[in-house]
């Protein structure tokens, strides 16, 4: 999790800009995460619905392309872990690490997912997913697939997107793959 001084610095940076802004990651406390989940279920919000439809159509083919043997999926900005279910249904996933800034919301979602998929080793990591994180040692021997669904990367400034992708590589390690 970002320290208080890091949060202050990021907020001040956004408020001192000519076009004021706040980092979107700070919208997603427990209440914000629940609100976003409700928004994604509205008929007007086509992004989630379209993305899920694309996954349903393309995941069988992607499974053949990805073809990792001992697979750990690391989801950046996991939120309610809604979309990972499609991955779990199509790929032979042995471990799953959802990363999100909203720890309460994340832990609740991960507990529910653990009940649905008891064969998958699930470890919820409460952290700022835009920064590199250290995964527990028990995942060192796994092939890693980074998963960053949605249009979230479109919310990043170019430099922030580049920094995120570099951090993703640091989190996952060499030889990883990423599905965005």
Please identify what each model-predicted range represents.
Residues 171-180:
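Conserved beta-strand signature within the Rossmann-like core of class I S-adenosyl-L-methionine
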Residues 117-131:
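Conserved SAM-binding strand-loop segment of SAM-dependent methyltransferases
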Residues 69-79:
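Conserved class I S-adenosyl-L-methionine
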Residues 80-92:
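Conserved SAM-binding loop of SAM-dependent methyltransferases across substrates and taxa
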Residues 1-26, 33:
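N-terminal auxiliary segments of SAM/dcSAM-dependent transferases
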């Amino acid at each position: 999790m970002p320290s208080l001084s890091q949060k202050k610095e990021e907020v001040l940076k956004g408020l001192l800009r000519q076009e004021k802004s706040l980092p979107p990651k700070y919208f997603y406390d427990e209440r914000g995460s629940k609100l976003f989940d409700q928004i994604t279920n509205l008929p007007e919000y086509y992004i989630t619905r379209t993305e899920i439809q694309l996954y349903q159509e393309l995941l069988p083919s992607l499974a053949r392309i990805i073809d990792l043997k001992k697979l750990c999926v690391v989801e950046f900005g996991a939120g309610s872990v809604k979309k990972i279910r499609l991955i779990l249904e199509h790929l032979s996933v042995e471990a799953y690490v959802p990363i999100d800034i909203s720890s309460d919301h994340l832990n609740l979602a991960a507990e529910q997912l653990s009940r649905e998929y008891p064969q998958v080793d699930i470890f919820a990591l409460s952290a700022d997913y835009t920064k590199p994180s250290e995964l527990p040692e028990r995942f060192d021997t796994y092939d890693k697939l980074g998963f960053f669904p949605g249009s979230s990367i479109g919310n990043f400034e170019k430099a922030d997107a580049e920094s995120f992708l570099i951090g993703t590589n640091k989190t996952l390690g060499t030889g990883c793959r990423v599905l965005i």
